[in-house]
Amino acid sequence: KTLPHHDNLKSFGACFGVSGGYERPMWFALDGEKAEYEYSYNYQSWYPSAEYETNNTIKNVGLFDLTPFSKFEIKSEKAHSELQKICTANIKNEPGKCVYTHMLNPDGGIETDLTVVCLEKNHFRIISSAATRERDKFHIRKYLSKDIELRDITDNLCVFGLFGPKSRELIKTISKENFENN
């Protein structure tokens, strides 16, 4: 599958790879570079681009396309209590609250790491790795009560992540929401 904005990404020099069933940018060619892999056991052709992107994100802000990440929803009167049983962190049942957490296996080992977002009371979106979509879906269903539906909405939504020390400055220019820690 390609992303909805594939052609736009390509026009900006994206070099694509596959992850989680999606063709997605792995890196962006710098001016004058070819947006293609030159495979080698030595210095990789994409190292300068990756270094530039990393440094820019560390010092400023970077926009990352996370559309292939797995996305699930549960909505039920018992949704919050069910998530409290299967997640290691305290899940907030308040709209807009977002919690990074883990799910464990019976031996106490980490099965997956994920983010749980409360959309409205007892209605949650769960976001996890693109590469572990089916495994995570199986694991979550295994521990949810059978009367709670887990919907896979991965292919229905685009997701972007804004990272870096200047990310809040940028998001304030496009949203009236409060993104401060509180």
Residue ranges and their predicted role:
Residues 1-182:
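Glycine/proline-enriched, intrinsically flexible loops and inter-domain linkers
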